[in-house]
Amino acid sequence: MSDINATRLPAWLVDCPCVGDDVNRLLTRGESLC
């Protein structure tokens, strides 16, 4: 079950604009750190 939830989580974040923006911001920050 956890694997399925983990797979659906990104899609759910993409569906939610507000959360998606936060995630994109974190991903961008992570790429900057790398």
From Swiss-Prot:
The keyword Repressor does not apply. Residues 1-10, 18-34 form a propeptide. There is a cross-link at A11-P17 (Cyclopeptide (Ala-Pro)). Expressed in basidiocarps. There is a cross-link at W12-C16 (2'-cysteinyl-6'-hydroxytryptophan sulfoxide (Trp-Cys)). Belongs to the MSDIN fungal toxin family. GO terms for molecular function: toxin activity. Keywords: Thioether bond, Toxin. This is Phallacidin proprotein 2. Processed by the macrocyclase-peptidase enzyme POPB to yield a toxic cyclic heptapeptide. POPB first removes 10 residues from the N-terminus. Conformational trapping of the remaining peptide forces the enzyme to release this intermediate rather than proceed to macrocyclization. The enzyme rebinds the remaining peptide in a different conformation and catalyzes macrocyclization of the N-terminal 7 residues. Toxin that belongs to the bicyclic heptapeptides called phallotoxins. Although structurally related to amatoxins, phallotoxins have a different mode of action, which is the stabilization of F-actin. Phallotoxins are poisonous when administered parenterally, but not orally because of poor absorption. InterPro entries: Amanitin/phalloidin (IPR027582).
